[in-house]
Every structure is written in C-alpha cells, then in structure tokens.
C-alpha cells in the first residue's frame, strides 16, 4: 500500500501542476494581447494621417489664382516666376533663408514699381509716358456736362484737390446739388439747350417758373411727363366729380308727395257744391226733402230719378243735427273744412282723413290758430266736416249732442253707418 499510495499522490501532484500551468499561460496570453491593443491605439493617435495619392496631386497643383494673378503695375504673372525660383512647395516643407530672401526681394520690387508708377503720373492724373492701353473718354451729350467739366477743371488747381478721384467726386456733388429729381433733370437740359450756357441760380429760378406752364419748344416726352398727364388726371377727376354730384342729387331727392285719396262719399266735391248752391238759391223745402228721403235705389225701382238725384245719393251722407238749407260759403271742400279745425287740441288720427291738415296743425303757431267754441247752437249753420269731427270729439268726451230738440245717444261707427239710410238731413263730408 505504501508504494502504490505514493504513486497516486505523485500523479495527483502532477495533474495539479499541469492545471495551474495552463491557467497561468492563458492568463499571460490575455494580458499580453490587452497590452498590445493598448499600444496599437497609442501609436495610431501619435502617427499623422497618411494622405492618398489623389489628394497629394490636388494639393501640389497650383491654383488658378496663382496662375492668373497680376500685380498692380506689371502685366505678367508673378506666381509662375515665384514658383520657378522657389520651386513647388509641398505640404510639410520648411522654407529656407534663401527662399525668404527671394520673397522679400520680390515684394520690394513690387513696391518700387508702384511708387514709380505714381511718380510717372503728373498732378492732373495723366501719365507722363505713353501707355499702351487707355480707357476711352465718353464725349459729353449735352451742355450741362460741358459746364460741369469746365467748373471741375477750374477747381483742379486748388491745394486740396489732386487726382482724378477728387475731381469726379466734386463733379458728382455738383450734379446732385443741381439736379434732384427726374423732372428737374429734363427741364435743366432743355433749358440750357435753348438759352445757352447759364448760371446755376438762373436755371433753378427758371425751373420754378416753368413748372406750371409748358414751353412751346419742349419735346413730347417732357410735355407728357409734366403736363399732359396732369390734364388727363384733372379731366378724369372733373368727370368723376360731375357723376358723383348727379348720383348724390338722385339719392338725396325727396320721395314723391302721396296723392290724396278722397273718401268714397266725397269723390264728387264740385257736383256736391253745385247742388248745395242750387238748393240755397231755390229755397224750396220739397225738393230738399226729396233728396233727404232718398234711400239708395236704382232706376229700375224708381224710374223718375234724375242724374242729380243719383249723384246726390252717392256723394252725400245723412247725418242728424244738420239742416237742409246751407248757404254757399258753408259748403266747402274737405280740405278747407279740415283747415278750419286747427284749433282742436289733441285730435286723433281718425277725426279727420286729411293727412296734410294733420301735419299743418302742428306747424302753425298758436297766434294763427282760429279756435272755435266747443258747442254750437242749433240756429247756427256749422260746416259739414267740422260737425262730423265735433261729433266724434263729443263721443270721446261722453257729452250728449242735442240737435233740433232730440237727444242723440252715444253711437258707434257701425251704428252711424247704419243711420246713413234713415236720417233726413243731407250733409257733405
């Protein structure tokens, strides 16, 4: 048992050693890989990015600005010369002292050439030597430009005015002072062309005088811009004003006066008035009694009826309290009868059918109102319409009307209409 047990124990020890060794190897492998990854990331961050070939070619090719750039004085390209002297500069190259010196020398040459150019020009801005290229000069189109250029040439000799820029600035300021708007510009040019060269004060004063009336020698466009358009506007405004006044008159015209419609029983006032005059002239009681005893009949029932009797039936009303004999002045039209009733206070609309008399009642002054007594004696001859209105007022006041010794009870409108065939006295409404 002894040697066998020792062999088993040694085998177990070897197995444990192998297991521990393998675990240590695996741990070391993972540790080494982790460290390698860390180092690789550090190297990538420290190393500069490598550009591709296409990118390098694009960076090395000179740009269009370098190829076609010109200096202020020379007509040749300076970029090509500098590239030939210094060579092609690539990314990352360090300029040497020689290259910096050449660049400084080139910059000094440019400065001296600019100064020489300024010296070559005289005080008026014109070049002393012949230039191969000159800008064309625009000829003056009108007399105003000639005046302004002459004034600018006179002011060139001043101490503060040197060079073309100041001259142009002075002339532009004078133009702005003389000509402020389009219409003044057109008038200034035409005025100078007609009258010749003149002062600025004269031209401005003439402009103010010529604003209202056009000159005969002006062109069509100037007249259209300043005169004809205003005429058209005035013409259209006048036409609109005339139309507007006509429309206003039509709108403000009062409504037509309504036509007065007479009562059905008073549609023949003239014939009724003639009958009353005939009755007053004849003075016969039998004839008037016949008129009063008429009830509405036709010729078939009574063939002895005349035209006057028939017209009296349809144009007369039987009313109690009226006498058959009436003088001529008492038989008046409904309008005159209603006009005589202006003194009655607070008359209802049903008391008189005349609309105009109702309106005139309120328009008249109290001095012109002819007041009438509230009650009349039986011997007096009342007017027909006044009696009808007085009867209605008495009905409202509940005062009994006594006529010819008979007591007339209070009656309604229907009863008064029914009494038209029964009463004996004929009156006119």
Curated annotation (Swiss-Prot):
Q: Where is the region Interaction with NHERF1?
A: 427-429
Q: Does the keyword Transmembrane helix apply?
A: yes
Segments spanning the bilayer are: 18-38
Instruction: Tell me which tissues or organs this protein is expressed in.
Output: Present in T-cells (at protein level).
Positions of region (Interaction with CSK): 314-317
Cell compartments where the protein resides? Cell membrane
State what the entry records as the consequence of deleting this gene: Mice are viable and do not show any developmental defect up to 20 months of age. They have normal T-cell development and normal T- and B-cell responses.
Tell me which residues bear Phosphoserine. 52, 63, 226, 351, 379
Biased composition range(s): Basic and acidic residues: 46-68, 393-413
Q: Where is the composition biased (Polar residues)?
A: 113-124
Residue ranges that the UniProt entry lists as topological domain Extracellular: 1-17
Q: Where is this region: Disordered?
A: 46-69, 113-134, 263-350, 364-429
Its PTM note reads:
Palmitoylated.
Give GO MF terms, alphabetically: SH2 domain binding
Q: Which domain of life is it from?
A: Eukaryota
Q: Which residues lie on this side of the membrane: Cytoplasmic?
A: 39-429
**Oligomeric form and interacting partners:** When phosphorylated, interacts with CSK. Interacts with NHERF1/EBP50. In resting T-cells, part of a PAG1-NHERF1-MSN complex which is disrupted upon TCR activation.
Report what the protein is called.
Answer: Phosphoprotein associated with glycosphingolipid-enriched microdomains 1
Could you tell me which species this protein originates from? Answer: Mus musculus (Mouse)
Q: Recite the lineage of the species.
A: Eukaryota, Metazoa, Chordata, Craniata, Vertebrata
Q: Quick one: which gene encodes this?
A: Pag1
């Amino acid at each position: 048992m002894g040697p066998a047990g020792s062999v088993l124990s040694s085998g177990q020890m070897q197995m444990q050693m192998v297991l521990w060794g393998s675990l240590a190897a695996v741990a070391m492998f993972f540790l080494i890989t982790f460290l390698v990854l860390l180092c690789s990331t550090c190297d990538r961050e420290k190393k500069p990015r490598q550009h591709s070939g296409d990118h390098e070619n694009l960076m090395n090719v000179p740009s269009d600005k370098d190829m076609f750039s010109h200096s202020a004085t020379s007509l040749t390209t300076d970029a090509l010369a500098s590239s030939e002297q210094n060579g092609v500069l690539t990314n990352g190259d360090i300029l040497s002292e020689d290259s910096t010196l050449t660049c400084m020398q080139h910059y000094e040459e440019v400065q001296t050439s600019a100064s020489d150019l300024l010296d070559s020009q005289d005080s008026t801005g014109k070049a002393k030597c012949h230039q191969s290229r000159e800008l064309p000069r625009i000829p003056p189109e009108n007399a105003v430009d000639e005046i302004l250029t002459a004034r600018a040439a006179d002011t060139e000799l001043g101490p503060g005015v040197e060079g073309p820029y100041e001259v142009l600035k002075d002339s532009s300021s004078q133009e702005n002072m003389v000509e402020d708007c389009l219409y003044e510009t057109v008038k200034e040019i035409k005025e100078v062309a007609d009258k010749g060269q003149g002062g600025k004060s004269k031209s401005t004063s003439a402009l103010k005088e010529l604003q209202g009336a056009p000159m005969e020698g002006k062109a069509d466009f100037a007249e259209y811009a300043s005169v004809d358009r205003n005429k058209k506007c005035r013409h259209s405004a006048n036409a609109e004003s005339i139309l507007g006044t006509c429309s206003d008159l039509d709108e403000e015209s009062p409504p037509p006066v309504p036509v007065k419609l007479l009562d059905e029983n008073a549609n023949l006032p003239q014939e009724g008035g003639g009958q009353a005059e005939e009755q007053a002239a004849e003075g016969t009681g039998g004839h008037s009694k016949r008129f009063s005893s008429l009830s509405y009949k036709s010729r078939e029932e009574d063939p002895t009826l005349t035209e006057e009797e028939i017209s009296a039936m349809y144009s007369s009303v039987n009313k109690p309290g009226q006498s058959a004999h009436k003088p001529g002045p008492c038989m008046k039209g409904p309008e005159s009868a209603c006009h005589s009733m202006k003194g009655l206070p607070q008359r209802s609309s049903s008391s008189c059918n005349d609309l105009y008399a109702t309106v005139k009642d309120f328009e008249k002054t109290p001095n012109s109102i002819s007041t009438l007594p509230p009650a009349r004696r039986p011997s007096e001859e009342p007017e027909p319409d006044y009696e009808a209105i007085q009867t209605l007022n008495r009905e409202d006041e509940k005062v009994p009307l006594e006529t010819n010794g008979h007591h007339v009870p209070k009656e309604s409108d229907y009863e008064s209409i029914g009494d038209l065939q029964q009463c004996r006295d004929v009156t006119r409404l």
